[in-house]
């Protein structure tokens, strides 16, 4: 899992990376290079930061990670838990 500062450095360092906003059953997550963004306070077991809306996830990318590039949006299949919906 990536913290927000780590994600920001990663996106600045490698401009070819494109974040993915993963739409799960009742929330959205941001994935960069296969790693999820960690919440502000780590939980046990670790879970990705969850956003209630697509707009909130996109706003987080633009505001906190200062990212202005392309974004992939992928829906997760609730039966398999994968992005192959």
For the regions a protein language model found, what residue spans apply to each?
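Short aromatic-glycine-(Arg/Gly/Cys) micro-motifs in beta-strand/loop hairpins
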Residues: 18-46, 76-78
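Intrinsically disordered, low-complexity charged/polar segments
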Residues: 74-85
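Flexible, charged surface loops at secondary-structure boundaries
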Residues: 11-14, 23-24, 66
């Amino acid at each position: 899992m990536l913290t927000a500062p780590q994600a920001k450095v990663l996106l600045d360092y490698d401009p070819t990376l494109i974040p993915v906003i993963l739409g799960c059953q009742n929330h959205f997550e941001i994935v960069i290079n296969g790693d999820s963004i960690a919440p502000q306070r780590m939980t046990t077991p670790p879970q990705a930061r969850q956003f209630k809306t697509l707009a909130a996830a996109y706003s987080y990318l633009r505001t906190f990670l200062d990212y202005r590039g392309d974004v992939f949006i992928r829906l997760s299949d609730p039966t398999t838990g994968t992005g192959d919906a």
